[in-house]
Amino acid sequence: MLIAVAGMSHRSAPVEARERVAFAPCAARSFLRRLREEDGVPEAVLLSTCNRTELYVVAEAEPARDRLLGLLAEDRGVEPGSLYRDTYWHTDAEAVRHLYRVSASLDSMVVGEAQILGQVRDAYRMATEERCTGPVLNRLFHTALRVGKRVRAETGIGDSSLSVPHVAAKLAGEVFGSLEGRRALVLGAGEMSELLVRHLRDRGVAEIRIANRTRERAERLAALFGGRAADLGDLPRELARADIVVSSTGSGEWVIRGPEVAAALESREEPLFLIDIAVPRDVDPVVQSIEGAFLYDIDDLQAVVERNAEDRQEAAAAAEEMIGPAVVEFMSWLSTLHVAPLIKELRDGAERIRRHEVSRALRKMDLSPEQEEAVERMSRSIVNKLLHGPISEIKARAGAGDPLDSAEVRRRLLSLRGPGVELHPSREP
């Protein structure tokens, strides 16, 4: 059995590669259903955000990499060769460590950002809803979420952290010198847009207009911050009015095209500043070649992030120290997973003997209900103490790669075939 992650992130590939393998929620569900039907991949979780697409699996053998990347390439309509070039592949302890680092935001573009923990939780929830998880990934993702929460609570890694929307607003401020009195157009009304509007308001933007495919959502977001809703159908006019345009719809097609930007610039004297934080991108890259238009995509934000990374180095180091023992603990559990049926067999066998012998003894005694319960408790305690050592030995041997079969355990560890002890209770005469 193999735990593995095949992934592509801002660390391994540029945005133009990442957007080709990004999944909308409905597409993610469809891909999980397809994986569920694949032989040799009993468990899978798909994590797709603006900065990463990662597939976590439990597979039967190392060749799973070829199969998984082939399925991913076919589903996304990309060349398998490009996936091999741009993806990373981690297995077993390194796959576990990677997920823990992702959940703790150590692998994020913005170290300490808060969104990733919720995104990991949502990805795991979707996989469970699609019946794609089992004992291994259930435990892995539960522990990953606990690690992420602990890191945030105990290291302060999220204190004064910069979310992607925060960085976008900061970059706009650096370009204009000040955002006081500026007009902003925000495309999209999701969580990223809400965070972005908040940061723009905090920096003094005078007018914010919000456009979304669903006008009602744009109106709700605008009402929260004293902005105004706009229609995407009026985009040419809205572009001409705005100083700053930030887009985060991730619709999968160009929301802002070159001719629209060129037309908007003809009716104004000042330049137009555009930030595209969507993956897939919303703004046609040809806009970069238009005089007076300044376009930044999500990869361009990395420079701003790096200037603010030093403040979080100490917290990140503390987080890494938490992750190491957590990886060891998970791998120790995993190494004993294959002997769980054996341990259950031993416990069940001992419990059958206990019940039989206690029942036989109680029939010969005249005890009150309280006294009978005391005998039951005593017998359970004796059995648990007798089994503790052998079960610990089984787990230790399994962890060392030396699992014992059922017969050998009975003979060498439990000695259940000793004088006067029967593995299966005899019938009463």
From Swiss-Prot:
Substrate binds at T49, C50, N51, R52, S108, E113, A114, Q115, Q119. It comes from the Bacteria. One of its GO terms (biological process) is protoporphyrinogen IX biosynthetic process from glutamate. Its EC number is 1.2.1.70. Coiled coil: none annotated. It holds the Pfam family GlutR_N. It catalyses: (S)-4-amino-5-oxopentanoate + tRNA(Glu) + NADP(+) = L-glutamyl-tRNA(Glu) + NADPH + H(+). Catalyzes the NADPH-dependent reduction of glutamyl-tRNA(Glu) to glutamate 1-semialdehyde (GSA). This is Glutamyl-tRNA reductase. It comes from Rubrobacter xylanophilus (strain DSM 9941 / JCM 11954 / NBRC 16129 / PRD-1). The lineage of its organism: Bacteria, Bacillati, Actinomycetota, Rubrobacteria, Rubrobacterales.
